[in-house]
UniProtKB/Swiss-Prot annotation:
Keywords: Glycosidase, Hydrolase. Belongs to the glycosyl hydrolase 2 family. GO terms for cellular component: beta-galactosidase complex. This is Beta-galactosidase. It comes from Staphylococcus xylosus. The keyword rRNA processing does not apply. Its EC number is 3.2.1.23. One of its GO terms (molecular function) is beta-galactosidase activity. It catalyses: Hydrolysis of terminal non-reducing beta-D-galactose residues in beta-D-galactosides. One of its GO terms (biological process) is lactose catabolic process.
Length: 994
């Protein structure tokens, strides 16, 4: 049946494919209007989604030698067969899954044979029948009624075949052979799970023989934006005798209508302009005698001028995210509801832009981004990252092997064409990207030129120019921006933004790698974006964690990542790197991005005079939002008032005197909350868009002491222990060997029964991946405290136990050395004071502080510090200072791969309680704290969230500080300013047991 094989021939990308065209589904005259929610509700479309008979073969040879093509098992289309028990589930980042031997692929090439029946009720020779596949990975052959129809590859491209001469009235049979690997595999080495199958819609279009095949829509604006032109051109037609164009405005009113020409220019006066802030759409109808093509049109103009990115004459910033097609239960298959949920979260998170990493999405997605309002960088299905792994790790000298090899020219240009031609009429697409991580060379030069020839109204992006051979001259004139991924803020400013010779805008196509507890350096990037006009923004890596849901445990999904499926090659949990979980529950990092992208922000403040800036591009602030001011006084009381806005134009700042609107007497702080004025499709009225806080004076806690300052203190000793009794109700036992507080007895109840610990270890975050081995080698993980000597000092108010200590581990010198002093006061308060020096030859510390182990019943938590999310030196812009309440169980977020989470810095008060007894921590200086039911050992060694088991203890950590989070899982090293790298540590706080 397979007479010719094309999947190992770089010159053959497809066989019998119809010329690529703009995407549309033609309706018949008299049918209801086309809308993406009901896109197949036309007699012109026969949807072939559903159950197909399916047979899996481990190799093409097995398929060819198997005469009995069984029709017993079925597989849903669209789907990926890997999630239905066939083949291997595999996650890879950069490595090729097959030997690098282009154009050849392994003989053991898994394949799936699909077949089903379909019916044509009224076959009419006056019509043509076109078979469409919107996405098949990676290559496929197709037959109708046992006749070969054609072949195609490019997984994320639309393939359309003319089957008019092969179908008949009544029942027909379709067969599709899908190959896992083809020569296209060398161009599809994206960072993702490697699935296979028919993963997007399949349908047949009934086409009138007199028809429009392809058309192009472009919009242009006058300089004053008071007039627009919509240019419509029929680029290819079939037997076309006449055509009518009709244009309707967003209210459904006809603007104009014209007949009889193949192109037309609509003049629109006082146009409604499309942007992410106001995604209004006109409707264009292209009518022939038997068909109606509907195209939504957003009137907008894209330009690059003065190293800036302009939409409708306004310089805008890209506040974007990279967005793979990934779902924990369906893999590559993304439905309308999946897209809508993601776009809803993006809108709620103040994102305005999406990069379709790293391939075009289905047309449905672009129809939705047109309607809901996003700036889209649409990317070609090209990635050859595996070439840097051919001769060792990250050998970038080999990055250009494919990009500069003429054998791949046809394939690369074909992929660029396939990414532009079907999608050219979507208004939300504001730039094209030639691909991802594929180096640079003559093929990319030609690809960029081809892209410009297809569409010169949108800028072209490609990051790979960075890796070009600097000894050769390449034409970069068709690449319209300078793009980088994961440079440090310092490198960006020094190399690009402060360079007077910069001749193109600068963009980050990937940054702030959001893996695990992250990102920790977002604010530094955003500061530069706002500071420099030429820094037009970026796309966070990435939107969602990639993981496979394999079941449920205790009502929570079980997620699995690379290496969990017995793969020979894999890249572990590197796929778990999004700002939302696989099931779209937002990570804390999501709220960091939301806050950084807030539409109104505080840019300066002097006493009660503040300066706010409207970050919106087109809407006056007062029409979009209002400001709610929450004032907290020094006693903890709160009042709420509204601060009026007026004539607050986009990209302008206004000075407001808070004292005109709030009570400033005895003020502690004020939080300015920016709230939406009205309901929109994804957000409700009063939805909080972001906030700013001004702290004038922190509140202090007035401690209530159970003991009198005159209470007697009694000290007794054994060989190992020092016992300090305060009156008859409190007893503290200290260990002479390690300077720990070994137990606390309060009113004959044991509060602490395990030694406190001096901690410098944290369960490594994903961003600690490049430093954690240095930490472990230096003995940080299992560090212990060694007491050299001690002394007991008594005075009228307290007894002080002064321990001279060193923090040590086998085979390494002491990391820290100095004194820890326990001051036992007559009122029952313990004061803990550290005065330590650090070995500066050792790596910077993960953390430093005291750990307490309490009974599990200590569950309720109150604190005065930064919340409600985790906060670290460089992560926590979504937080604010306030009184917060939570539980130990709910503190922080447990990541798919467990790691450090749940710390709260800038704290001065913590209370943890079992409902009766309390442990209270206070300090005049801020500290960090964390509390959990999982030990550091368990969090460090457990590889999956569902394997964690809550322990019968509550762990409370009081930290001088932790090192920052950063984004070094893929980005720059942690900024030195956020490393716990002190030579000297002085730390003091109070412990009280009530």
């Amino acid at each position: 049946m397979l007479k010719q094989q094309f999947h190992e021939n770089l010159e053959v990308q497809h066989v019998n494919l119809l010329p690529r065209r703009a995407f549309y589904i033609p309706y018949q005259q008299g049918e209801a209007d086309y809308h993406f929610e009901t896109r197949y509700n036309t007699r012109n479309a026969t949807l072939l989604n559903g159950e197909w008979y399916f047979q899996y073969f481990e190799s093409l040879e097995a398929y060819l030698n198997h005469s009995n093509k069984q029709e017993s098992k079925t597989l849903t289309v669209p789907s990926v067969w890997n999630l239905y028990g066939y083949d291997q589930i595999q996650y890879l980042n950069t490595q090729y899954p097959i030997p690098f031997n282009p154009p050849y692929v392994p003989k053991d090439n898994p394949c799936g044979h699909y077949t089903r029946k379909f019916t044509i009720d009224e076959y009419d020779q006056q019509y043509d029948y076109h078979l469409n596949f919107e996405g098949v990975d990676s290559a496929f052959y197709v037959w109708i009624n046992n006749e070969f129809i054609g072949y195609s590859q490019i997984s994320h491209a639309i393939s359309e075949f003319d089957i008019s001469n092969f179908v008949k009235q009544g029942e027909n049979n379709i067969e599709v052979l899908v190959l896992k690997y083809s020569d296209g595999t060398y161009l599809e080495d994206q960072d993702m799970f490697r699935h296979s199958g028919i993963f997007r819609d399949v349908y047949i279009l009934k086409r009138a023989t007199e028809r429009v095949d392809d058309f192009k829509v472009e919009t242009n604006l006058s300089d004053d934006l008071n007039a627009a032109q919509i240019d419509v051109k029929i680029e290819r037609a079939h037997n076309l005798k006449s055509v009518e164009f009709q244009l309707y405005n967003p209210k459904g009113e006809e603007v104009a209508s014209i007949s009889g020409v193949n192109e037309h220019q609509f003049d629109v006066h006082n146009p409604h302009l499309w942007s992410t802030e106001n995604p209004v759409l006109y409707t264009l109808y292209i009518l022939t005698d038997q068909e109606v093509i509907t195209q939504k049109v957003g009137i907008r103009e894209v330009a690059i001028q003065n190293n800036q990115f302009y939409i409708n004459g306004q310089s805008i910033k890209i506040r974007g995210t990279n967005y793979h097609d990934s779902h924990p239960e369906t893999g590559y298959v993304m439905t309308e509801s999946h897209f809508k949920k993601d776009l809803e979260l993006m809108k709620q998170g103040n994102f305005n832009a999406i990069r379709t990493a790293h391939y075009p999405k289905s047309p449905l997605f672009y129809e939705m981004t047109d309607q809901y309002g996003f700036y889209v960088m649409s990317e070609a299905d090209i990635e050859t990252h595996g070439v840097v792994r051919l001769y060792g790790e990250d050998n970038n000298e080999d990055f250009n092997i494919i990009a500069d090899d003429s054998k791949f020219e046809t394939a690369i240009i074909e992929r660029i064409e396939a990414s532009i031609m079907p999608l050219k009429n979507y208004s939300s697409i504001v730039s094209w990207s030639l691909g991802n991580e594929s180096g640079f060379g003559k093929n990319m030069v030609k690809g960029a030129a081809r892209a410009k020839s297809l569409d010169n109204t949108r800028p072209i992006h490609y990051e790979g120019t960075l890796y070009r051979d600097k000894q050769q001259h390449y034409d970069l004139s068709n690449i319209d921006m300078i793009s980088r991924m994961y440079p440090s803020p310092e490198e960006i400013e020094e190399t690009y933004l402060s360079n007077p010779d910069l001749d193109k805008p600068f963009i980050l196509c990937e940054y702030a790698h959001a893996m695990g507890n992250s990102p920790g350096d977002l604010h530094a990037y955003q500061t530069l974006v706002e500071q420099y006009d030429s820094f037009i923004g970026g796309f966070v890596w990435e939107w969602c964690d990639h993981a496979i849901q394999t079941g449920m445990k205790d009502g929570n999904p079980i997620f699995r990542y690379g290496g969990d499926f017995g793969e020979k090659l894999h890249d572990g949990n590197f796929c778990v790197d999004g700002i939302v979980f696989p099931n779209r529950v937002p990570h804390e990092g999501y709220y960091e991005f939301k806050q950084e992208h807030r539409p109104l922000n505080l840019v300066s403040q002097e006493d009660f005079k503040i300066v706010l800036r409207n970050q919106l591009d087109f809407i006056p602030a007062e029409k979009y939002m209002f400001v709610e001011a929450t004032v907290t006084n020094l006693n903890g009381g709160k009042t709420i008032s509204e601060i009026p806005l007026s004539n607050f134009l986009p990209h302008t700042a206004q000075t407001i005197d808070l004292s005109d609107y709030i009570n400033i007497q005895h003020i502690s702080d004020v939080i300015l909350r920016y709230k939406l004025k009205y309901d929109d499709i994804f957000r409700h009225e009063n939805f909080e868009l972001g906030h700013d806080q001004i702290v004038y004076q922190r509140r202090t806690l007035k401690e209530q002491n159970e003991q009198s300052d005159e209470t007697e203190i009694l000290v007794t000793q054994t060989d190992k222990l020092i016992k300090v009794s305060v009156g008859k109700s409190e007893t503290y036992v200290f260990n002479k060997d390690n300077a720990s507080l070994e137990s606390v007895l309060k009113h004959n109840h044991i509060v602490i029964s395990q030694n406190t610990t001096n901690n410098i270890w944290r369960a490594p975050t994903d961003n600690d991946t490049n430093i954690k081995n240095d930490w472990a080698y230096s003995g940080y993980k299992d560090i212990t405290t060694r007491v050299h000597d001690y002394q007991i000092v008594e005075n009228e108010t307290e007894v002080s136990l002064i321990f001279n200590i060193a923090m040590v581990n086998d085979a390494v010198p002491p990391v820290l050395f100095g004194t820890v002093t326990w001051h036992v006061q007559r009122n029952g308060t313990l004061n803990v004071t550290y005065d330590l020096e650090r070995d500066m030859k050792a790596p910077y510390l993960p953390r430093f502080g005291l750990g307490l182990t309490l009974p599990k019943a200590f569950e309720q938590v109150k604190y005065y510090g930064k919340g409600p999310f985790s906060s670290y030196q460089d992560k926590g812009v979504a937080n604010y200072l306030d009184d917060f309440g939570t539980t130990v169980t709910d503190n922080g977020e447990i990541h798919i791969r467990p790691q450090e989470t749940g710390s709260h810095n800038e704290t001065t008060f913590v209370e943890i309680s079992d409902g009766c007894k309390k442990v209270i921590v206070t300090s005049d200086n801020t500290f960090s704290f964390n509390t959990t039911h999982y030990s550091l050992k368990q969090l460090t060694e457990t590889t999956h969230k569902d394997a964690l088991e809550p322990e019968d203890q509550t762990y409370l950590y009081i930290d001088y500080a932790q090192s920052g989070i950063g984004s070094n899982s893929c980005g720059p090293e942690l900024n030195e300013a956020y490393r716990l790298n002190n030579r000297h540590i002085e730390f003091s706080f109070n412990l009280k047991f009530v």
